[in-house]
Amino acid sequence: MSLSGLISTTTFKEQPAIVRRSGNYKPPLWDAHFIQSLQVIYTEESYGKRINELKEDVRRILEKEAENPLVKLEQINDLSRLGISYHFEDQIKAILNLTYNNNNALWKKDNLYATALHFKLLRQYGFNPVSSEIFNAFKDEKKEFKESLSKDVKGMVCLYEASFYSFRGEPILDEARDFTTKHLKQYLMMTRQGQNVDHDDDNDLMVKLVEHALELPVHWRMKRLEARWFIDMYAEMSHHHHMNSTFLQLAKLDFNVVQSTYQEDLKHVVRWWKTTSLGERLPFARDRIVEIFLWSVGLKFEPQFRYCRKMLTKIGQLVTTMDDIFDVYGTLDELSLFQHALGRWDINTIDQLPDYMKIFFLATYNVVNEMAYDVLKQNGILIIKYLKKTWTDLCKCYMLEANWYHSGYTPSLEEYIKNGWISIAEPLILVNLYCLITNPIKEDDIDCLLQYPTFIRISGIIARLVDDLGTSSDELKRGDNPKSIQCYMKENGICDEKNGREHIRNLISETWKEMNEARVGESPFSQAFIETAIDFVRTAMMIYQKEQDGVGTNIDHYTKDGIISLFFTSIPI
């Protein structure tokens, strides 16, 4: 048969076009050339000597005895909010130990501010037990908080902040939160209406503090951004209340010098991201290397963790890209092939993958192996199998969500959360972080960590729910899986999304109580590492502030402001 005859008698099946979704993500805000052009001014070499002198001055201040323990507590609180308490952990613990073990509490008797500040600091620094029953002293014969307390705005703010360190089964702190929230809102309303007589600079500062607290409590805020805000507030206070000028000088210099290390590290990760070509080759995915670096600073802001931040940023951007592959771009068959290849962790298996997956797999493979090699050099332990497990666990959860989407299945809220606290990638990030900051690494400890203990599960749940509040509206518009809000609504026959969102907010608040318990509970892991799990949540609450998506569709709002203040704007000295 002639070739022309073969062509004329053969029916060719046209391959159906693959329909792929789009996340409609905005391009990156930050130009790589701008990042590389940043001028580093406040270097350790130039300002290290002055910082060390100021640190010695602060140590002397902390070690100087005070007649009233409240003075020392205020110093600790100021150092914490200024972002420099990490230099003085030993001195702070020594002071708090004295107040914790001292039964003579006349200095705080009938003083709401002193009582609340002491309680807050003890819980903040992990002392246990610290009974919330001390606040019964501020109730009346009806067992309700005395209305007269509302006149003590400073004490009310402190009680409000303290209430966010509550455990389960502490109704008095729930009552305290409701009571203070109500009266602080009334205080703001009356001040705006000119009904507060004392309208002066002090009152203006108090209004700012109250507004800031009601927007989000300090316990829920990203530490470094909170420090940046409070440094400006402290400078304003110093003109009226004779705040400690040494504290302020150190806070400003410390912030600027640490910011310089962030600038250098940001240049590094931006160069790395450019060399991967993933931003160009996978244009459907979020190109958010600067925003992810902000997240790494939220987890470990101290200057000694530079390598940790750089590696976490690389890992975080890869996780974000993989999330978009599964959520937006990949077909079910492609995703299944990718899951198999990742499970094998063998570059010889990637020939069967589509091109966009090949380059992504190799980029991930190289970063994970680079990290494992560095840890092997430093610690003498091979961690590939541990890192691989975190990636395969995450991929398994992504795959389940993809199957839900393609089958049109809506899980129950419990089923959704059971998968979602892992798919938020918090377990992967924390296991990697543990390997980056721990020396020596003990196999028993990392085996335990890979069982994802309670503090990892709880922080993952909160982060997932916070993420859902910020992203569900945009994701549903493009046809994504139902989020926790919609799962709850369908399960309970609720039509009004406001009710669904309110339930998730309440669930977040209740789960925070479990997180507070985990901070002081028995664990083979250090309190500092457990605190990092909480910092993951704090950073999530900043990224998705006011229930907006600061990594996906709303990058030019709160996240942008945070990046500018932390990385690009130094504090005038």
Curated annotation (Swiss-Prot):
Motif (DDXXD motif): 323-327
Metal-binding is among the record's keywords: yes
Gene3D superfamilies: Farnesyl Diphosphate Synthase, Terpene synthase, N-terminal domain
Keyword terms of this UniProt record: Lyase, Magnesium, Metal-binding
Pathway(s) this gene product operates in, as recorded in its UniProt entry: Secondary metabolite biosynthesis; terpenoid biosynthesis
CDD domains: Terpene_cyclase_plant_C1
Entry annotated with the keyword Nucleotide-binding: no
EC annotation from Swiss-Prot or TrEMBL: 4.2.3.15, 4.2.3.121, 4.2.3.16, 4.2.3.-
GO molecular function: magnesium ion binding; terpene synthase activity
Protein name per the record: Myrcene synthase TPS5FN
Organism: Cannabis sativa (Hemp)
Lineage: Eukaryota, Viridiplantae, Streptophyta, Embryophyta, Tracheophyta
